[in-house]
Amino acid sequence: MFAVIKTGGKQYRVAANDVLTIEKLEATAGDSIEFTEVLVIGEGADAAIGAPFVTGASVKAEVVEQNRGKKVIAFKKRRRQNSKRSRGHRQHHTVVRITDIVAAK
């Protein structure tokens, strides 16, 4: 069984025991979280498609760790003006493991 969940402005296709990196959530390692914004749930022809969400469906996950992504460098240079600027940014991420997919009853 799979589900498509929405979190952090993105959509993810998940199944049981999947490990995925999502935008930062306020939780610590070992916490249990639940995603209620489920867009699609099921398997094959038995898939239920929400409009926009499937009512009563949820996906349970466990937080594995909080980490940061690779550094992204934003570099600006203005030609012939001896002017340049370099800025770095590292996005915060949460790594979660999907534990259970609960279908609507």
From Swiss-Prot:
KW Transferase (keyword) present: no
One GO cellular component, as annotated: cytoplasm
One Pfam family recorded for the sequence: Ribosomal_L21p
Keyword Cell wall biogenesis/degradation: no
Domain of life: Bacteria
GO molecular function terms noted in the UniProt entry: rRNA binding; structural constituent of ribosome
InterPro entries xref list: bL21-like, bL21-like_sf, Ribosomal_bL21
GO biological process per UniProt: translation
Alphabetic keyword roster: Ribonucleoprotein, Ribosomal protein, RNA-binding, rRNA-binding
Function summary: This protein binds to 23S rRNA in the presence of protein L20.
Quaternary structure, from the entry: Part of the 50S ribosomal subunit. Contacts protein L20.
Family to which the UniProt record says this protein belongs: Belongs to the bacterial ribosomal protein bL21 family.
NCBIfam families: L21
Protein name, UniProt field: Large ribosomal subunit protein bL21
Organism listed in the record: Rhizobium leguminosarum bv. trifolii (strain WSM2304)
